[in-house]
């Protein structure tokens, strides 16, 4: 074979060899290449799911709220949340039960204290976490957990990614009603309940927290009532009171602390009885609340117990977590320690303090 032909065959063979090697390398690279990110909707079963139990009466326009919550869920890799609106006939019990049956990872209560309490009653003891999206006037549990108010986006992020904290639940039987109810912050009878009853939703919608001030002025002229107080099986005590409150935590609106020793997770209920006389008496009591002094005034008494029974001489206005529930004469309380799991903001560590959460 002539040299030019040999040379040509050599060139062809070399080209074919190089081509074959290139193909093999390409196939190898293709085999070991890691898979790229997959769209979330390819494996929906693997994405965590939240349910939102929302009180629509707390919003003028609900659609932006829903859009914000959904946007946060999808941005954090969660499935689109279940959206369950409360009604006048069902303020959250059926909706929360449906959420549990759907196997959700967390239930977000979006509304006022009544919505939060109703959802908590269903979740207590289940281990399923409660997320708080404060949208009421009081927002008492959120205040006692140091949550930011009026921030649906931030609250949603905490509800989905925050730490879990087991808190106590107060349980209560009222008069002859066999159904046990729950409260998360405070419950009681007398002056405080009269304030809640005289601050209707329409007034709160117009003037906000000022509605409670107006209602308090209306209730100042009420009379004292006699109550029998029993705690943890000890001998009964009798008092004349204007109001008696049993608390799971102690902070009210405006930073006021009615029960400085109350803790959400100590397994104890705090009891405070207030019996001022006249305007000067109310001023003295108010001073004790403002200065957070637990002792030293004979018109303000504090106790702690796991079991508390209050029996009034006559039916008195009563309230649960700031919601009026009509009149009651006998209220039996017990502390259910650590019964409810709540999502709270993670504590700020030095590392987190420098983390802005985004690009510079």
Each language-model region and where it sits:
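ATP/NTP phosphate-donor binding region
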Residues: 1-107, 349, 359-360
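ATP/nucleoside-binding phosphotransfer catalytic cores, i.e., glycine-rich phosphate-binding loops
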Residues: 2-27, 231-238, 263, 273-360
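Catalytic core of DAGKc-family lipid kinases
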Residues: 75, 86, 124-129, 133-242
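Short glycine/serine/threonine-rich phosphate/pyrophosphate-binding segments
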Residues: 92, 114-119, 140, 167
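N-terminal glycine-rich "phosphate-gripper" loop used for MgATP/nucleotide binding
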Residues: 109-113
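Glycine-rich phosphate/pyrophosphate-binding beta-alpha loops
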Residues: 188, 192, 245-258, 324
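Short acidic/glycine-rich loop or secondary-structure boundary segments that cap or lie
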Residues: 192-195, 237-239, 252-255, 279-282
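Gly/Ser/Thr-rich active-site loops/lids in small-molecule metabolic enzymes
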Residues: 203-211, 254, 260-281
């Amino acid at each position: 074979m002539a040299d030019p032909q040999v040379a040509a065959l050599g060139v062809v063979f070399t080209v074919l060899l190089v081509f074959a090697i290139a193909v093999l390398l390409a196939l190898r690279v293709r085999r070991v290449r890691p898979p790229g990110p997959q769209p979330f909707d390819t494996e929906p079963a693997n994405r965590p799911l939240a349910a939102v139990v929302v009180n629509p009466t707390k919003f003028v326009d609900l659609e932006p709220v829903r859009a914000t919550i959904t946007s946060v869920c999808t941005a954090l890799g969660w499935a689109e949340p279940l959206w369950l609106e409360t009604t006048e006939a069902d303020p959250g019990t059926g909706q929360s039960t449906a959420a549990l049956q759907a196997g959700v990872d967390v239930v977000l209560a979006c509304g006022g204290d009544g919505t939060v309490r109703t959802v908590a009653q269903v979740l207590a003891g289940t281990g399923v976490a409660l997320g708080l999206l404060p949208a009421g006037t009081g927002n008492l549990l959120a205040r006692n957990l140091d949550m930011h108010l009026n921030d649906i986006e931030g609250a949603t992020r905490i509800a989905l990614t925050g730490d879990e904290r087991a808190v106590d639940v107060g349980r209560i039987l009222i008069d002859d009603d066999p159904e046990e109810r729950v409260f998360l912050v405070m419950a009681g009878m007398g002056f405080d309940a009269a304030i809640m009853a005289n601050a209707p939703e329409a007034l709160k919608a117009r003037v906000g927290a000022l509605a409670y001030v107006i209602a308090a002025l209306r209730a100042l002229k009420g009379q004292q009532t006699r109550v029998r107080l029993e705690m943890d099986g000890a001998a009964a005590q009798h008092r004349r009171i204007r109001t008696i409150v049993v608390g799971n935590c102690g902070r009210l609106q405006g930073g006021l602390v009615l029960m400085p020793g109350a803790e959400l997770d100590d397994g104890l209920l705090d009891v405070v009885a207030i019996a001022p006389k006249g305007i000067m008496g109310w001023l003295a009591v108010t001073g004790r609340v403002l200065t957070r002094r637990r002792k030293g005034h004979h018109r303000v008494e504090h106790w702690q117990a796991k079991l508390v029974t209050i029996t009034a001489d006559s039916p008195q206005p009563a309230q649960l977590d700031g919601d009026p529930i009509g009149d009651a004469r006998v209220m039996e309380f017990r502390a259910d320690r650590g019964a409810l799991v709540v999502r709270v903001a993670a504590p700020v560590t030095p590392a987190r303090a420098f983390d802005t959460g985004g690009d510079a």
